[in-house]
Amino acid sequence: TKKHRIRIIHDMTRVAENAYFIQQKEKGYERRSIKEIVKEICSYTDGATMSAKKDALVNIGGFLAVNDWDVFEEARNMVVVYEGLHTYGGLAGRDMEAMAIGIGESVSDDHIRARVGQVIYLGNKMTEYNVPIVKPIGGHGIFVDAKKFLPHIKQDHFPAQTLAAEI
């Protein structure tokens, strides 16, 4: 990024799940905590955005984090116009506190193991009952393979939308 002056801003929305799969599947990460892996991921970027409604387990909010003072100043000046002061970004104190707690919980090895484990359990059960799903099973949801589930519906008749409407 320094050589070409192109900043990398990472969308951190599912970072805990990604860190979990790195921990489980990549050599050399087996003994590292989710928190350590997330910190390493962040070290490769110039900043990050996050919708806290996903991994941070809250119903509102998100954030922009940068490690460049000039970018911070520019963002701080813009947030006043759109969201409120930079100290709270339009969020109530209770929402910021919940987000802080949620971020901490989201990088807990026990939490993410249980959460991803539930998804894997559901995916395996669906497979056991011959429901065609997209594989490999991910960390936040199971996707029914609509083409295989409704093979009589041609692609140009939108099998996925048909399945969603029927459900």
Where are these regions (language model features)?
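Cationic-aromatic interfacial patches
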Residues: I137
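Active-site loop ensemble at the mouth of alpha/beta enzyme cores that anchors a bound cofactor
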Residues: K147-I167
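Conserved PLP-enzyme active-site core in the AAT-like
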Residues: T1-I133, V144, K154, Q161
